[in-house]
């Protein structure tokens, strides 16, 4: 509704951090510019998922907090208890000041402490039943969103809104999806569920006080049955359904159903009982979904040091959900610096449910302000052997050290695995001892990033979290090293299933899934080099397949238009010239 002062636009970005950046920096700048041109002030609000706000019912009436958390003087409490006390005091101050008790504004705390003052979506009593419904922070955030012309949210909440019939966001007239290259992954995450023995046991114990018959014990037993089934299964995808695992899932489903029935009929003010019932209902819904073995879902067994073995379930595709629930009724703009893969929008369009031919969308490629061909070099180490799954090769390590030496540090190393990053850090520390080599895992990432920025001659090595979002302009980063093309792991159950589905439908599963995934990450990683008009440097890809494989041209077309070479001496000479010019400029 062009020009309508009541029209509402929703902007959804990938992460909470980017949401905060938009709300605190970019949106106010845009609003000020709009006011200057039109004379109108555009109202705006931020909307996040429920668990990002304090729950006053948990703060004021909640049970189950550690006793030490109830100590009046935080100095007398320790660890978790002190954090909870601080959060509760802050929340009460937020309520008094008409704030929103947004987690981003909270005092320093651990996830465990935040869990004591917030509530999962399914366990929320709802504004009508909750004694604090009229002063609920979530309800207030929604009221502010409904009163605003511009609402800033995230991909996950957009997905929840689509899955639940438009209940999470206010009605809107247009939607802008920022960082749209991450949309499929974020929506997939929001639509995925997991089921583990510890999770089932925890919920069963919450239900026990109100279950007088055997149903409570059967719920506990179901957790043991699930553990046994997972222990017998192989880690990975179970496309046909492992009999022992499926039997265990059905056991959990049936026990959860009995618990839900047994907990029914409680009074509205029996908060803990109602929340226990909601938790049991969630376990039932997850187990029921998994037990169906629907063709639209992918189910697999995972194992981690923290959670042990778990059963995971994710949608095979989110294209239909996006096409029917997001794109069908609104004008939608998808924006990102890396939407063109292989030189066009077809791959991204297909992944979000649009016609790859362009019949139902218009693609606009806005030229970059950067002259990539003059500002950067793409060096592909064609002389190296193709990377293997056995770890980074000695020749590749030597290549990294030589490039880092030529760049005088100032290197961002992007690696396919933590093991490769650590191996490269050890090697370079030994071979180039006069340079500081920081490695992900040595400290918290924000601290490492700050150290990288503060010391212009330092280098930072890491994995996926460094590929996207790291913004280090200037001489701090003259060299970006990518050890291998970032294809998904061959044993990734979800990617494996999606690739197989495309192939069975007559398409090229590898190009549609694996190459698209790699192209997106390569574009993001290479994009770390040039951040301003004055930046210069080299992107070094130590994977010869970028120029020797048939899919190499597709991946190269996904990258910024750097001048390309396969000659190591050319890359090293360019890096040394940058060092010389930097010193000359400093002396001048």
Language model segments and positions:
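Conserved RecA-like ASCE P-loop NTPase motor core of nucleic-acid helicases/translocases
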Residues: 8-17, 333-335, 409-416, 540-542
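Conserved interdomain linker/interface between the two RecA-like ATPase lobes of SF2 helicase motors
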Residues: 197-277, 374-405, 411
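A contiguous, basic/glycine-rich beta-loop/short-helix subdomain that forms a polymer-engagement track
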Residues: 115-149, 164-166, 258-382, 391-398, ...
């Amino acid at each position: 509704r062009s020009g309508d002062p009541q029209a509402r636009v929703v902007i959804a970005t990938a992460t909470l951090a980017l949401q905060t950046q938009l709300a605190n920096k970019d949106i106010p700048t845009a609003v000020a510019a709009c006011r200057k041109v039109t004379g109108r002030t555009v109202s705006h609000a931020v909307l996040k998922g429920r668990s990002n706000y304090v729950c006053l019912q948990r703060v004021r009436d909640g049970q189950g907090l550690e006793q030490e958390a109830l100590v009046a003087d935080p100095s007398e409490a320790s660890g978790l208890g002190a954090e909870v006390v601080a959060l509760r005091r802050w929340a009460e101050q937020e309520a008094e000041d008409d704030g929103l008790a947004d987690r981003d504004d909270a005092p320093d705390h651990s996830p465990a402490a935040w869990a004591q003052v917030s509530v999962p979506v399914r366990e929320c009593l709802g504004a009508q039943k909750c004694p604090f419904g009229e002063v609920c922070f979530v309800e207030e955030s929604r009221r502010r969103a409904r009163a605003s012309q511009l609402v800033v949210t995230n991909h996950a909440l957009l997905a929840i809104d689509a899955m639940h019939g438009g209940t999470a966001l206010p009605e809107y007239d247009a939607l802008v999806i920022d960082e749209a290259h991450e949309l499929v992954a974020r929506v997939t995450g929001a639509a995925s569920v997991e089921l583990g023995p510890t999770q089932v046991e925890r919920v069963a114990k919450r239900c026990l006080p109100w279950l007088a018959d055997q149903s409570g014990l059967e719920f506990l037993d179901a957790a043991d049955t699930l553990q046994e089934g997972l222990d017998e299964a192989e880690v990975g995808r179970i496309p046909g359904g492992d009999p022992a695992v499926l039997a265990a899932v059905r056991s959990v489903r049936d026990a959860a159903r009995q618990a839900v029935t047994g907990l029914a009929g409680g009074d509205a003010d029996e908060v803990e009982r109602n929340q226990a019932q909601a938790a049991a209902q969630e376990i039932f819904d997850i187990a029921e979904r998994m037990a169906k073995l629907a063709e639209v879902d992918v189910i697999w067994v995972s194992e981690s040091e923290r959670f042990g073995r778990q059963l995971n379930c994710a949608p095979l595709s989110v294209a239909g959900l996006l096409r029917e629930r997001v794109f069908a009724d609104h004008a939608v703009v998808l924006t990102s610096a890396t939407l063109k893969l292989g030189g066009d929008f077809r791959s991204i369009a297909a992944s979000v449910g649009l016609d790859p031919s362009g019949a139902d969308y218009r693609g606009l490629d806005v030229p970059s302000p950067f002259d990539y061909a003059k500002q950067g070099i793409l060096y592909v180490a064609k002389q190296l052997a193709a990377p293997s799954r056995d770890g980074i090769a000695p020749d590749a390590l030597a290549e990294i050290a030589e490039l880092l030496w030529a760049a005088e540090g100032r290197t961002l190393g992007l690696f396919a695995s933590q093991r490769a990053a650590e191996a490269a850090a050890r090697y370079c520390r030994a071979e180039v001892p006069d340079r500081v080599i920081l490695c992900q895992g040595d400290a918290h990432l924000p601290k490492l990033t700050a150290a990288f920025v503060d010391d212009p001659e330092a280098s930072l090595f890491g994995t996926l979290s460094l590929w996207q979002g790291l913004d280090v302009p200037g001489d701090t980063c003259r060299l970006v090293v990518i050890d291998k093309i970032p294809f998904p792991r061959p044993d990734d159950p979800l990617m494996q299933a999606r690739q197989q589905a495309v192939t069975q439908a007559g398409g090229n599963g590898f190009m549609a899934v694996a190459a698209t995934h790699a192209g997106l990450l390569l574009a993001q990683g290479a994009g770390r080099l040039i951040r301003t008009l004055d930046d210069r440097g080299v992107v070094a890809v130590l994977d010869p397949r970028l120029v020797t494989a048939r899919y190499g041209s597709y991946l190269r077309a996904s990258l910024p238009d750097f001048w390309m070479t396969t000659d190591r001496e050319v890359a090293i000479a360019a890096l040394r010239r940058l060092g010389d010019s930097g010193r000359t400029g400093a002396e001048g």
